[in-house]
Amino acid sequence: AIEVQTVTLIPGD
């Protein structure tokens, strides 16, 4: 994740 990462349960984020 190239951003402010919140709790996102997505593989490959």
UniProtKB/Swiss-Prot annotation:
GO molecular function terms attached to this record: isocitrate dehydrogenase (NAD+) activity; magnesium ion binding
A cellular component term, taken from the record's GO annotations: mitochondrion
Keywords: Mitochondrion, NAD, Oxidoreductase, Tricarboxylic acid cycle
Catalysed conversion reaction: D-threo-isocitrate + NAD(+) = 2-oxoglutarate + CO2 + NADH
Cellular location(s): Mitochondrion
EC number, as in UniProt: 1.1.1.41
UniProt keyword Coiled coil present: no
Domain of life: Eukaryota
Predominant subcellular localization, coarse grouping: mitochondrion
Gene Ontology biological process terms, A to Z: tricarboxylic acid cycle
Activity regulation text: The heterotetramer and the heterodimer composed of IDH3A and IDH3G subunits can be allosterically activated by citrate (CIT) or/and ADP, and the two activators can act independently or synergistically. The heterodimer composed of IDH3A and IDH3B subunits cannot be allosterically regulated and the allosteric regulation of the heterotetramer is through the IDH3G subunit and not the IDH3B subunit.
Record's keyword annotation contains Oxidoreductase: yes
Enzyme's top EC category: oxidoreductase
Main function: Catalytic subunit of the enzyme which catalyzes the decarboxylation of isocitrate (ICT) into alpha-ketoglutarate. The heterodimer composed of the alpha (IDH3A) and beta (IDH3B) subunits and the heterodimer composed of the alpha (IDH3A) and gamma (IDH3G) subunits, have considerable basal activity but the full activity of the heterotetramer (containing two subunits of IDH3A, one of IDH3B and one of IDH3G) requires the assembly and cooperative function of both heterodimers.
Family as reported in the entry's similarity comment: Belongs to the isocitrate and isopropylmalate dehydrogenases family.
Subunit structure: Heterooligomer of subunits alpha (IDH3A), beta (IDH3B), and gamma (IDH3G) in the apparent ratio of 2:1:1. The heterodimer containing one IDH3A and one IDH3B subunit and the heterodimer containing one IDH3A and one IDH3G subunit assemble into a heterotetramer (which contains two subunits of IDH3A, one of IDH3B and one of IDH3G) and further into the heterooctamer.
Protein's name according to its UniProt entry: Isocitrate dehydrogenase [NAD] subunit alpha, mitochondrial
Organism, scientific name: Canis lupus familiaris (Dog)
Organism placement in taxonomy: Eukaryota, Metazoa, Chordata, Craniata, Vertebrata
